[in-house]
Amino acid sequence: MKLVKLNPDCIRDILICVESLKFGETIEFLDIINVLEEYDTDEVLYHIQQCEYNNFFTKTNHFAQSLNGRIYDLTPKAHEFLANIRSDNLWRKTKSAASKIGSVALPVLQQIASNVVEGAVKS
């Protein structure tokens, strides 16, 4: 297993993937891994775990670092974050602002995204 650092693009792609579910559907970790082919398995699993730690999922079922997990839905917090970063333009601005700081934690990235949206609304 290689070392993994936080990849905001992977987080965004996972959230978009989970958001695409119809009401009442769930998605398996393997399905997310198969959809997000640009990332390796360990990277996707690591970022699913980071989403869990940041309370982005209402419920998950799995064993630690297992491929056989399942995600049930996004939390309101995740929906809000995704609404702020869904637009490619706002996402680029968010990543640009974050890069000026350096490596940022997920809560900081959420705040930056919120600030970018507020700035877009004011202009």
Language-model segments: what does each one mean?
Residues L3-L36:
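Short amphipathic alpha-helical interface segments
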Residues P8-R12, D42-L45, Y72, P76-H79:
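Non-catalytic, well-ordered alpha-helical scaffold segments
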Residues E37-N54, G69:
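Short amphipathic alpha-helical interaction segments
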Residues E52-F63:
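A short, conserved structural fragment
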Residues S66-A97:
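Short, amphipathic alpha-helical interaction segments positioned at domain boundaries
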